[in-house]
């Protein structure tokens, strides 16, 4: 067994401990189900029956998102079942989904004395995944580090793996143009007292130079010198005031500026490689200074940036609506009834964010659907090709 598989950090491009990631119920694969198995099951159905494509995801929370991606491609000839891999023991995350697919194949090869030397390019996934079985995972940093780790190589080289481009689904749930609608869902108040798009743009621009440094370290597998956890500490808001929202942006900008200066002194010969990476992120990978928030750690963005800001805004809007009810009520009984009714109609911020599907209008979501369409078209071409 490769020593790389025994290194938890090596297979965790985020470099964060399990306790640092959002804890969600996840599972590993069991049995020997593969795309070929599913294709055989499809052939047993009547000729008029739709083909079933199994899409494995990382967690229960991911099922709705990937359903929203794939449902567009269902037709009279195919449909998708989005599900978690089943196992006796719950496991967590993308590594569980991808590594279990590969390790089952290796064990089969060992039993048949056909085991091949361990590869890092993700090709071992091909025999399990296929036109009837795909994997759908969060990109994390694996998309941006371009094969620097084994898991990243699988993301880049496996044709039947779809990923989010953004760090995670949580980032897309925080898609800036959709956040006002979430506020309305929470408060039932459509008064636009805060410009989410502009504020998220400024926040992204403030953290972008330091974000490039973080990716620079992970590309070289020296992330221990500047981990995601270190990066998150620097980009914390340090308090948010609705009366002066620019103040926390300036605070983050100052902290990032100081950290960038320190990194430049630590790596005096890195200027050219840093600038080359910056160009690559913008021109090839779609990361812009204005959209950096989509690529930072998802649960940090969700819990430490977006939810705290929304709490201040929603509190103000709820208070505004309650004052309106008090002014318009004809008597105290009506006021109490209306306030009680309104209170029971407001919603939890985190829950509404998790249900937010405004990301379907984002360019990132369009890229994911384009990948799904390409995969399905190539699969159809392969299936229609004459057998040798």
Kindly label every feature range from the protein language model.
Residues 2-388:
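Acidic, divalent-metal-binding catalytic cores of TOPRIM
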């Amino acid at each position: 067994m490769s020593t790389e598989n025994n290194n938890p950090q090596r297979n965790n491009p985020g470099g964060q401990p399990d306790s640092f990631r959002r804890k969600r119920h996840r599972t590993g694969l069991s049995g020997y189900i593969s795309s070929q198995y599913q294709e055989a099951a499809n052939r047993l159905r009547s000729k008029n029956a739709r083909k079933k494509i199994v899409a494995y995801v990382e967690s229960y929370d991911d099922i709705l998102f990937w359903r929203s991606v794939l449902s567009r491609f269902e037709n009279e000839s195919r449909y998708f079942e989005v599900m978690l891999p089943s196992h006796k023991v719950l496991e967590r995350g993308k590594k569980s989904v991808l590594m279990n697919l590969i390790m089952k194949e290796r064990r089969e090869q060992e039993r048949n004395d056909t085991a091949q030397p361990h590869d890092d390019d993700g090709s071992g996934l091909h025999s399990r995944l296929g036109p009837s079985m795909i994997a759908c995972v969060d990109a994390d940093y694996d998309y941006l580090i371009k094969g620097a780790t084994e898991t990243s190589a699988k993301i880049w080289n496996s044709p039947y793996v779809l990923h989010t481009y953004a760090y995670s689904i949580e980032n897309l749930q925080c898609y800036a143009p959709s956040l006002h609608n979430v506020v309305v869902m929470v408060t039932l108040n459509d008064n636009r007292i805060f410009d989410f798009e502009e504020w998220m743009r400024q926040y992204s621009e403030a953290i972008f130079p330091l974000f490039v440094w973080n990716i620079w370290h992970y590309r070289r597998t020296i992330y221990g010198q500047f981990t995601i956890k270190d990066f998150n500490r620097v980009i914390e808001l340090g308090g948010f005031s609705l009366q002066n929202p620019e103040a926390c942006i300036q605070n983050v900008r100052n902290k990032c500026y100081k950290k960038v200066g320190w990194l430049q002194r630590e790596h005096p010969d890195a200027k050219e490689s840093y600038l080359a990476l910056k160009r690559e992120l913008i021109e090839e990978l779609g990361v812009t200074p204005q959209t950096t928030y989509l690529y930072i750690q998802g649960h940090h963005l969700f819990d430490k940036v977006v939810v705290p800001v929304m709490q201040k805004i929603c509190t103000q809007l709820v208070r505004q609506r309650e004052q309106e009810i008090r002014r318009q009520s004809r008597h105290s009984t009506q006021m109490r009834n209306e306030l009680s009714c309104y209170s029971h109609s407001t919603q939890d911020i985190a829950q509404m964010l998790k249900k937010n599907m405004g990301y379907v209008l984002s360019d990132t979501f369009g890229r994911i659907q384009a990948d799904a369409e390409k995969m399905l078209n190539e699969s159809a071409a392969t299936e229609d090709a004459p057998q040798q």
